Each structure stands twice: as C-alpha cells, then as structure tokens.
C-alpha cells in the first residue's frame, strides 16, 4: 500500500525542485534522505520534509516493513502564480511571476 504526503502551494518554482525529485525517485527512504541532506538547494529541505512526512504517515498507518520503504512517486507540479509589476523606463511595467509548486511524495 502506498503512503502519501503533499506540500501544496510551496513557495518555490517547480523547475527548481523537479531535478531533486528525479534524484530520489526509486530510492529507499533512508538513502533518499541522505541524498537530500547533502544537496545545497532550498528545494531539498522542502522535499526532505515531505519525505519525512510520508514516512511518518506509513508508520502511523501501520506499515508492515518500515525499513524497506521505497519512494515510488516523487512528483512536483506547478501551482498558482502571484503576478507583480516592476516599473521600467518610459512608463512601462514588466510582470514578475512569483511561482508556487505542489510537491507530492509516495512511499511503498
């Protein structure tokens, strides 16, 4: 049975977190946590928290083998955007997009 954890509306762009999710997909949970611990990215901290939450969900729901849990799904989807205007020369304005993402991790 798969145990899942989600972080909706994470305040980071999905393109920054997706490569980290690709690193841990298919790994055992302890190994994936070790990989994320030594990544120098802010998204690694977020992904690490979601992975720990998925492991805690498995423990809480009575998973039979906690030592052999594997990451079966690590998905990062795009979320909503805040749009801000940055004043530019000659009365113009450029749109600055503050991107959000949804981080989903399943272990089995």
Tell what function each PLM region has.
Residues 1-23, 27-108:
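Structured, basic alpha/beta domains of bacterial-type, RNA-associated proteins
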């Amino acid at each position: 049975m798969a145990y899942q954890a989600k972080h909706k509306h994470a305040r980071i762009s999905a393109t920054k977190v997706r490569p980290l999710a690709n690193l841990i997909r298919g790994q055992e949970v302890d190994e994936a946590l070790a990989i994320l611990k030594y990544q120098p990215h802010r998204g690694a901290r977020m992904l690490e928290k979601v992975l720990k939450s998925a492991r805690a969900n498995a423990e809480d729901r009575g998973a039979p083998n906690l030592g052999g849990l594997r990451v079966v799904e690590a998905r990062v989807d795009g979320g909503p955007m805040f749009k801000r205007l940055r004043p530019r020369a000659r009365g113009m304005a450029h749109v600055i997009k503050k991107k959000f993402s949804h981080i989903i991790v399943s272990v089995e």
